[in-house]
């Protein structure tokens, strides 16, 4: 909640949230089941009544790029409040600024962590403020950052409690669960803070496997396969090696097995030379699961200390 509890019309960040939430919702396209002209007009009216945001009919169209940008701006806004104050600083000094360089080097309030000569004329220096000498920054607010992340987790825990042992996998803002014939389905809606179905209404997951946090794959009723592994670029070549079948094989048959994928043009940063260049990168994939205790001779996990 980004409004003042005493005055719902006094929004601290309302304008910012409304702008990018509007862009995100419009670029998501029409929701499943909204097909007729009457359905579309009713959807716009319901959204305005619920969120106080007026969607533009002509602007509602699937645009993955715009949706990603709007989502990034919404999410990074909260992270900014929790940003560390004492971030490393970079300074460049020309040969005519030797006095400034030495003032920085011997400043008792600064800790110089690195410097090197770029060329005959320029010097590059990295430094940060020492301990309790960090200046107060009024653009950060740890209380807002903590409240936002805690509130999101409370919503997640509430859903996990309702689903119980039906849960197969969950992350910060997503849950994959088993749905039986008589099981009650969580409510989905297109509004802020509510659940949305990431699959089409006429499709569902039939096989699922996970090799750890942010590391899972599944196959749907319609035959679509999805594989998501943090830190791995799954372009066409790599997806021939890392996919649903290969992950399932590792988890169910040989959990010590490793797979190697290659990125022929990895963008690498060379700090000392302050340059970017492409290089060949080889990465190994293997089962890594250390956040919960794995129950022996099963695929169940339990929290540590349970």
Task: Place the predicted regions along the sequence by residue.
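Conserved acidic
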Residues: 1-306
């Amino acid at each position: 909640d980004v409004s003042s509890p005493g005055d719902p019309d006094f929004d601290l960040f309302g304008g910012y949230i409304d702008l990018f939430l509007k862009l995100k919702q419009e670029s998501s396209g029409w929701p499943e089941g909204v097909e007729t002209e009457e359905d579309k007009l009713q959807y716009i009216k319901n959204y305005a009544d619920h969120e106080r945001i007026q969607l533009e009919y002509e602007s509602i169209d699937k645009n993955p790029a715009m949706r990603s940008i709007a989502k990034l701006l919404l999410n990074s806004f909260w992270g900014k409040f929790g940003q560390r104050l004492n971030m490393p600083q970079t300074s460049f000094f020309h040969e005519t600024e030797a006095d400034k360089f030495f003032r920085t080097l011997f400043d008792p309030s600064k800790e110089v962590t690195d410097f090197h000569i770029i060329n005959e004329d320029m010097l590059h220096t990295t430094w940060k403020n020492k301990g309790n000498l960090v200046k107060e920054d009024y653009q950060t607010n740890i209380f807002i950052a903590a409240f936002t992340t805690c509130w999101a987790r409370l919503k997640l825990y509430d859903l996990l409690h309702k689903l119980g042992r039906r849960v197969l996998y969950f992350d910060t803002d997503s849950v994959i669960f088993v749905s039986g014939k008589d099981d009650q389905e969580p409510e989905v809606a297109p509004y802020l803070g509510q659940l949305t179905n990431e699959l089409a209404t006429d499709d569902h997951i039939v096989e699922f496997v996970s090799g750890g946090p942010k590391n899972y794959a599944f196959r749907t009723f319609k035959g679509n396969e999805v594989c998501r592994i943090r830190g791995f670029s799954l372009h066409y070549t790599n997806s021939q090696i890392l996919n649903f079948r290969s992950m399932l094989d590792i988890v169910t048959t040989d959990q010590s097995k490793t797979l190697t994928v290659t990125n022929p043009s990895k963008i690498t940063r060379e700090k000392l030379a302050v340059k970017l260049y492409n290089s060949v990168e080889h990465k190994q994939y293997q089962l890594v699961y250390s956040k919960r205790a794995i129950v022996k001779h099963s695929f169940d996990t339990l929290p540590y200390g349970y």
